[in-house]
Amino acid sequence: MAQVKSSSKSDPNYKVVAENRRARFDYAIESDVECGIILEGSEVKSLREGGANIAESYAAVEDGELWLVNSYIAPYKQAKTFQHEERRRRKLLISRKQLSDFWNATQRKGMTLVPLVLYFNHRGMAKIKIGVAKGKKLHDKRETAAKRDWSRQKSRLMKDHG
């Protein structure tokens, strides 16, 4: 199960349910947009318990609509009769202008739509942040890892000698 994080004590409704941490390593994110997501009742209750994974999922524009494909929402134990499919396609809610921008972005070579974070906003509504991303090459990933390691070493040195 995913760990549920809360952003602040003043806002009890805001909760990060699932985060795609690998996306920032594998992709160069150009821009991101907050989208609504159409869910069934048992899916919402399962998300509130923290049972979701968006690491293997992606978003796609099909027939003038935006879909979240291959995202996992764990089954809700108390829903016996009206259980949801764990890996079904879920429709994302977005304005027409943003949809056309996404369509144009995915038509460029190497661009894809990657889910970054799934959360409940301050009003308690389930939202997902979708990023327009370009896949990194192996040498770019190595460069990112080297920068991250160097910043860790710098902070350790400053802590030891500071």
UniProtKB/Swiss-Prot annotation:
Q: Which GO terms describe its cellular component?
A: cytosol
The entry's keywords: Cytoplasm, RNA-binding
Please verify whether the record's keywords include RNA-binding.
Answer: yes
Q: Where is this region: Disordered?
A: 140-162
What's any GO biological process attached to this entry? Answer: trans-translation
* GO MF terms, alphabetically ordered: RNA binding
Q: Which domain of life is it from?
A: Bacteria
| Location(s) in or outside the cell | Cytoplasm
The record's InterPro entries line, in alphabetical order, gives:
SmpB, SsrA-bd_prot, SsrA-bd_prot_CS
Please list the disulfide bridges: none
Q: Which SUPFAM superfamilies match?
A: Small protein B (SmpB) (SSF74982)
Job description of the protein:
Required for rescue of stalled ribosomes mediated by trans-translation. Binds to transfer-messenger RNA (tmRNA), required for stable association of tmRNA with ribosomes. tmRNA and SmpB together mimic tRNA shape, replacing the anticodon stem-loop with SmpB. tmRNA is encoded by the ssrA gene; the 2 termini fold to resemble tRNA(Ala) and it encodes a 'tag peptide', a short internal open reading frame. During trans-translation Ala-aminoacylated tmRNA acts like a tRNA, entering the A-site of stalled ribosomes, displacing the stalled mRNA.
Family the entry assigns = Belongs to the SmpB family.
The protein's matches in HAMAP family, at most eight in alphabetical order, are given as: SmpB
Question: Record's PANTHER family?
Answer: SSRA-BINDING PROTEIN, TMRNA-BINDING COMPONENT OF TRANS-TRANSLATION TAGGING COMPLEX
Q: What is this protein called?
A: SsrA-binding protein
Q: Which organism is it from?
A: Roseobacter denitrificans (strain ATCC 33942 / OCh 114) (Erythrobacter sp. (strain OCh 114))
